[in-house]
Amino acid sequence: MLHIGLDVGSTTVKIAVLDDENNAVYKNYQRHYSDIKKTIAEVLGGCLETIDEKNVTVAVTGSGGISVSHWLGIPFVQEVSAGTTAIQTFIPQTDVAIELGGEDAKITYLTGGIEQRMNGSCAGGTGAFIDQMASLLNTDITGINELAKDYTTIYPIASRCG
């Protein structure tokens, strides 16, 4: 049996297909440029060879997940819960996890019980902000990482809207 996870965020669609031993047999990450249905069709179409005619389970998460859940008739899993389950399964020694989405940021503390926090929908300090900075610097996310690795000064940036 294969397990398909679909993450529909504010800027991207991600898919992972896992086998029964939790090995990734297919994965894809694609920007949707506000054409979510087309992008979902593309990422699902891309995994058809992998799926073949095997039995599958499917679930969707992310900020766009509820509407996709209704559209496709598949279960929805809240994104912080989905992320916490993935962390506990794949990297159980993790103490703290931080996830920067396109319009929000989430932090999960895993030691001494689970505590989760998430900011309101806002691009300040999130992936959309980082994308904008990359564009202004005429690079991409990988380029931002390369530029940052030799830093000499840390500059404060706003981490909230307004």
Which functions belong to the PLM regions below?
Residues G64-E115:
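Conserved phosphate-binding catalytic cores of ATP/NTP-utilizing and phosphoryl-transfer enzymes
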Residues A41-G45, G65, S69, S81-Q88, ...:
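Predominant activation on well-ordered alpha-helical scaffold segments within soluble catalytic domains
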Residues Q30-S34, V80-A86, G120-A128:
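Short, acidic/turn-prone active-site loops that include or flank metal/cofactor-
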Residues Q30, G73, V77, N119-A123, ...:
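Hydrophobic alpha-helical scaffolding
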Residues T152-G162:
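Short, intrinsically disordered, charge-balanced linker/junction segments flanking boundaries
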Residues M1-V80:
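N-terminal glycine/serine-rich phosphate-binding loop of ATP-dependent small-molecule kinases
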Residues G112-K149, T153:
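Glycine-rich phosphate-binding loop plus the immediately following alpha-helix
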